């Protein structure tokens, strides 16, 4: 099984994913969009993002998922995003519904991070004021998938991390 942390911007996803990976000594696979925007193409305009840049991010994220064993259930791993984020982003920004992005393996366990925490400014964030609306899209997409979704709606990073750790311990113990 693999653990995917998903949800809107500024909900502690990346921080929790990294800490969980360290705690359980699991491979952490980062979000490609941030790598693209910070390292590969740092001068990219993000609001609005050009379709060509989105396409490069989608291509990079899908290649990263594939190369890091997302579709292979061996060895648990922690992913900081997957095709669900791309599906929601593509639908929201370009009105392009791409169900291929929702071809999710059955061994994926989702941790949906809620936007009930204060959003922190980051120059790469573009939808802080729309987190509640976008969160509903995540809820709806994840409801349609057969995968398990664990909701992280605690009000602090520490509480979310504690809850996620407990849930992952339970899942890992149940799989033995």
PLM segments and residue spans:
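Hydrophobic anchor at the beta1->P-loop junction of P-loop NTPases
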Residues: 5
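The conserved Walker
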Residues: 9
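Conserved glycine(s) of the Walker
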Residues: 12
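Conserved Walker
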Residues: 15
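Conserved substrate/cofactor phosphate-moiety recognition/catalytic segment
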Residues: 18, 22-64
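Glycine-rich phosphate-binding loop used to anchor ATP phosphates in small-molecule kinases
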Residues: 58-105
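A glycine- and Lys/Arg-enriched "phosphate-lid" helix/loop adjacent to the NTP-binding pocket
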Residues: 94-159, 172
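C-terminal accessory "lid"/substrate-recognition subdomains
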Residues: 151, 165-176
């Amino acid at each position: 099984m693999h653990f995917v942390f998903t949800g809107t911007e500024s909900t502690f996803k990346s921080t929790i994913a990294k800490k969980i990976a360290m705690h359980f000594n699991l491979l952490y696979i980062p979000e490609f969009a941030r790598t693209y925007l910070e390292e590969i193409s740092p001068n990219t305009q993000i609001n609005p993002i050009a379709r060509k840049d989105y396409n490069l991010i989608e291509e990079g994220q899908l290649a990263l998922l594939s190369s890091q064993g997302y579709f292979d259930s061996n060895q648990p791993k922690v992913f900081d995003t997957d095709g669900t984020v791309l599906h929601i982003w593509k639908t929201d920004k370009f009105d392009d519904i791409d169900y291929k992005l929702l071809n999710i393996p059955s061994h994926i366990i989702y941790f949906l991070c809620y936007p009930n925490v204060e959003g922190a400014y980051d120059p790469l964030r573009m939808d802080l004021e729309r987190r509640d609306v976008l969160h509903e899209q995540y809820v709806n997409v994840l409801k349609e998938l057969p995968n398990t979704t664990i909701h992280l709606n605690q009000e602090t990073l520490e509480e979310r991390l504690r809850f996620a750790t407990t849930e992952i311990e339970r899942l890992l113990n149940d799989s033995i």
